[in-house]
């Protein structure tokens, strides 16, 4: 699974995001300047590949060296791409929110690595992976597919209410899964949170796919 995630999924979704989010933003926001620094993209892709190698070698204590810079790069791109301005249009906002999950996941991976280096304990469980898989991958699939479909169909570039609600469902599922792994206060109801998050994700994805 590490090979598929770090050598395939993350590089592809990151590259598509780097190319398309500024482009789509330029079609909606006035006086928008596209920022797509390719040197930064290649730098991030390099860090991602090394992260994957360290994961395969189970060298978790050193992941923070890669993941925290990745988080900073992602937050920087979100800022330069106009994160706050994107909320003027929901169809654009979902793209920016989805990309933010990549930065959040890298923060969680980095912090977990630092704590593991000091204590030898995995304190966040699978929370970083949930932020990456549910928050980033799933949300970006919905956001990008919705934008591309509307554009190619010649329909108004507006996100309908149902798709917006389903997108919020993905956000809720990601947050619940992260809380279940991170919060000690939620330990007693962890199985219930897993079930609720899973059902929300399945329901939202099924409705969107239909």
Question: What is each of the regions a protein language model found here?
Answer:
Residues 1, 15-37, 53-65, 77-96, ...:
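Juxtamembrane membrane-water interface segments of multi-pass membrane proteins
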Residues 1-13, 125-136, 199:
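Alpha-helical transmembrane segments
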Residues 9-14, 69-79, 139, 202-207:
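Alpha-helical transmembrane segments and their membrane-interface exit regions
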Residues 9, 36-47, 94-107, 164-174:
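Small-residue-rich segments of transmembrane alpha-helices in multi-pass membrane proteins
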Residues 46-52, 73-76, 173-177:
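Hydrophobic, membrane-inserted alpha-helices
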Residues 10, 19, 100-103, 130-148, ...:
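Core segments of alpha-helical transmembrane spans in multipass integral membrane proteins
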Residues 3-5, 64-73, 197-200:
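Hydrophobic core segments of alpha-helical transmembrane domains in multi-pass membrane proteins
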Residues 70-79, 96-106, 136:
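Specific transmembrane alpha-helix
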